[in-house]
Curated annotation (Swiss-Prot):
It catalyses: D-glucose 6-phosphate + NADP(+) = 6-phospho-D-glucono-1,5-lactone + NADPH + H(+). SUPFAM superfamilies: Glyceraldehyde-3-phosphate dehydrogenase-like, C-terminal domain, NAD(P)-binding Rossmann-fold domains. Keywords: Carbohydrate metabolism, Glucose metabolism, NADP, Oxidoreductase. Belongs to the glucose-6-phosphate dehydrogenase family. NADP(+) binds at R63, K168. The active site is at H260. This is Glucose-6-phosphate 1-dehydrogenase. It comes from the Bacteria. One of its GO terms (cellular component) is cytosol.
Length: 511
């Protein structure tokens, strides 16, 4: 098979996308899983597709005393195991010439002086013109320290040439998020800060804005007059996966709801932006989150449910309870499941509930946004399968099988006027003949191009934390620990989560 880099783009009809300027990508925490499993495989894939400058240079930073050659071999294994493979040895060799390693401690000022000098030398060697992207793929407690040290060493001084990428979580509550934002904004401008949430790199998430605002048939229906409610689901089949140290201090509310689910929510509920520029879109996301609240502040049990998985069965094998996982507290009350009901106080959404849920050890891995429309005001037809007609449902599938489906009623064959529900289905891989790209691919290119559209702004982070703050304050209180519910691994949710939506006369979608 001909490697992508060696193909003639004119012959295969490719449009050449804008390529970032030559630059150095400095990855802090480069020996971690994210770099080997996600970042570098995505970068190499883009290298094959000619979407990155040939001068692109990657410098890995970590405490381990690795050589450049060892680092290159480590990343090669990642591309082979987690990416699309090397494809052509000469292509990999060219790419690997731009991979370097810089051992050092994140809190050592002298290391940053050494790093600055080495980057300057690489500018001369590789022709990267002083352009820098610093990617903080480290434990959250090191975000502030790394930013301070980079600022003190003068490596963030040029807003036109330097960028700082921060992985989630952005704080662990409103107060810590404000502190982190203050530190970041003290050493560089907001225009240099890229708070990355990989969900925003997924095709269906990006397509949500196009779907809403480029199709005249949907946006006029996108309001309280036609929509009954919205369900947003992020279900995972995995357990802790060796992350007990982090997860014990986070839980599902901090790990998933405040970032991933709130991002999906804001894109679904936002008003049309005045432009497709970064701030045009982000301004509207902030506005809708600021107008959002829990359904009942006085009685939080009517707004949200937390759960933790017990021992159960997944794919025919027994799996342990959360408390029995390696590294977990045997008496832990950390939630692995959250369901919540949000309301938006504006004209478009007044009275329309948004139900959000996420959990670990669910029966299947699925992420979707389901828009359920109101039923017809007068029923003239009889359903062939049930007493009432099913409502129309528009589903945006984020993963797996990214795509969009619309459920509607049709007449069954024969002389009767009975109806049944059918789905009109669109899938990216079928329609475009190839699977969607890795989420990090789009985000990394956008960052290098200086496009902040798919990255979270400081005020949006703080607005999201404000929405969930009442739950954090209650659930973090040891006196409220007994309020957690339990569900068996391999099942969808605790009974209390069913009650949360059933008391409104609705039910969770079957997935």
């Amino acid at each position: 098979m001909t490697p992508k880099l060696l193909e003639n783009p004119l012959r295969i009809g490719l449009r050449q996308d804008k390529v970032p300027e030559p630059q150095i990508l400095v990855i802090f925490g480069a020996t971690g899983d994210l770099t080997q499993r996600k970042l570098v495989p995505a970068i190499y894939e883009m290298h094959l597709e000619r979407r990155l400058p040939p001068e692109l240079t990657i410098v890995g930073v970590a405490r381990r005393d690795w050589s450049d050659d060892y680092f290159r071999e480590h990343l090669r294994q990642g591309v082979e195991q987690f990416g699309g493979g090397i494809q052509a040895e000469e292509v990999w060799n060219t790419f690997a010439q731009g991979l370097f390693f810089a051992p050092g401690n994140i809190d050592d000022p002298q290391f940053y002086q050494t790093l600055r000098d080495r980057l300057a030398n690489l500018d001369e060697l590789r022709g990267t013109r002083g352009n820098r992207t610093f990617y903080l793929s480290v434990a959250p407690r090191f975000f502030g320290e790394a930013a301070k040290q980079l600022g003190a060493a003068g490596m963030l001084a040029d807003p036109a040439k330097t960028r700082l990428v921060v992985e989630k979580p952005f704080g662990r509550d409103l107060s810590s998020a404000q502190v982190l934002n203050a530190i970041l904004q003290n050493v560089c401008r907001e225009s240099q800060i890229y708070r990355i949430d990989h969900y925003l790199g997924k095709e269906t998430v990006q397509n949500l804005l196009v779907f809403r605002f480029a199709n005249a048939i949907f946006e006029p229906l996108w309001n309280r007059q036609y929509i009954d409610h919205v369900q947003i689901t992020v279900a995972e089949t995995v357990g802790l996966e060796g992350r007990a140290g982090y997860y014990e201090t986070a839980g599902a509310l901090r790990d998933m709801v405040q970032n991933h689910l709130m991002q999906l929510f804001s894109l679904t509920a936002m008003e049309p932006p005045n432009s497709l520029g970064a701030d045009g879109i982000r301004n509207e996301k902030v506005k809708v989150v600021q107008a959002t609240r829990l359904a009942d502040i006085d009685d939080l049990s009517l707004s949200a449910v937390r759960g933790q998985y017990k021992a159960g069965w997944m794919n025919g094998r027994s799996v342990p309870a959360y408390r029995d996982e390696e590294g977990a507290d045997p008496q832990s009350f950390t939630p692995t499941y959250v369901a919540m009901k949000l309301l938006v106080d504006n004209w478009r959404w007044q009275g329309v509930p948004f139900y959000l849920r996420t959990g670990k050890r669910m029966p299947k891995k699925v992420t979707e946004i389901a828009i359920q429309f109101k039923t017809v005001p007068h029923l003239m037809f009889q359903s062939a399968t049930q007493k009432v007609n099913s409502p129309n449902v528009l589903v945006l599938r984020i993963q797996p099988n990214e795509g969009v489906s619309l459920r509607f009623e049709v007449k069954t064959p024969g002389s009767s006027q009975r109806t049944r529900s059918v789905d009109m289905d669109f899938r990216y891989d079928t329609a475009f003949g190839s699977p969607t790209q890795e989420a990090y691919s789009r985000l990394l290119v956008d960052c290098m191009l200086g496009d902040q559209t798919l990255f979270t702004r400081a005020d949006e982070v703080e607005a999201s934390w404000r929405v969930v703050t009442p739950l954090l304050e209650s659930w973090d209180d040891p006196r409220q620990a007994a309020g957690i519910s339990f569900y068996e691994a391999g099942t969808w949710e605790p009974a209390e989560a069913e009650q949360l939506i059933n008391r409104d006369g609705r039910r969770w979608r079957r997935l």
